[in-house]
Amino acid sequence: MASPDWGYDDKNGPEQWSKLYPIANGNNQSPVDIKTSETKHDTSLKPISVSYNPATAKEIINVGHSFHVTFEDNDNRSVLKGGPLSDSYRLFQFHFHWGSTNEHGSEHTVDGVKYSAELHLTHWNSAKYSSLAEAASKADGLAVIGVLMKVGEANPKLQKILDALQAIKTKGKRAPFTNFDPSTLLPSSLDFWTYPGSLTHPPLYESVTWIICKESISVSSEQLAQFRSLLSNVEGDNAVPMQHNNRPTQPLKGRTVRASF
């Protein structure tokens, strides 16, 4: 079975991505290390407002390098507004990044500290664009909420997601995933950092307004192990567990990280 043109191992991992995706060396790449002493408190930032309708939750899919929970995005039932955004952005999926051990796994870091995993809730600008495909490469096309996950207590809010993983063990498998409000995964405080960045895997478009929550959420060692037990191969091929899928931090190159607090 041919391997995809990118992944996370030595042959096709982040160090190699620039060969096929030159933007990998661009000026607005993500993730980044948030140096708290260099962030700028911006009083003009509004509070984040999320309004997610559980009825829009649709499907859970093993995409080979991760799994996605997808949402119906043909109307404004599940939207993100406020914060640094001047438009309304529609939720279309969320996914996680994790590492081969609990010591690392997040993509963003804070003062060099790595977290065990990271949740990304991905939205597109439905005020200006007519589809995700149209918005994906535009500078103001996407907005992603990033939530750092710290190993510790089991997080009961993750249970429904973990229970669904059995049905999507191998690449290409999908299963219905309905009646779920992902705002339950957010931390109690919505204080955030924000900066202009990119998708953290190919095509690496520099089209993302990042909103990183200051407060982390918990995940247990056992819960993380369930993420890693997913397979990146198709059914019938040799088992290749999804050990890690996190890109190293990229240089800020003059960008400012603003803080809401």
UniProtKB/Swiss-Prot annotation:
Record-listed Zn(2+) binding positions: 95, 97, 120
GO molecular function: arylesterase activity; carbonate dehydratase activity; cyanamide hydratase activity; zinc ion binding
Domain Alpha-carbonic anhydrase: 4-261
Keywords: Acetylation, Cytoplasm, Lyase, Metal-binding, Zinc
Subcellular location as annotated: Cytoplasm
Keyword Cytoplasm: yes
This protein's record includes keyword Cytoplasm: yes
Stretch list, region Disordered: 1-31, 240-261
EC number: 4.2.1.1, 4.2.1.69
InterPro entries assigned to the protein according to its UniProt record, in alphabetical order: CA_dom, CA_dom_sf, Carbonic_anhydrase_a-class
Pfam annotation, one family: Carb_anhydrase
Binding positions (substrate): 200-201
Top EC class of this enzyme: lyase
N-acetylalanine carried by residues: 2
GO cellular component, one term: cytoplasm
Family, as annotated: Belongs to the alpha-carbonic anhydrase family.
The protein's name in its UniProt record: Carbonic anhydrase 1
Organism of derivation: Gorilla gorilla gorilla (Western lowland gorilla)
Lineage start: Eukaryota, Metazoa, Chordata, Craniata, Vertebrata
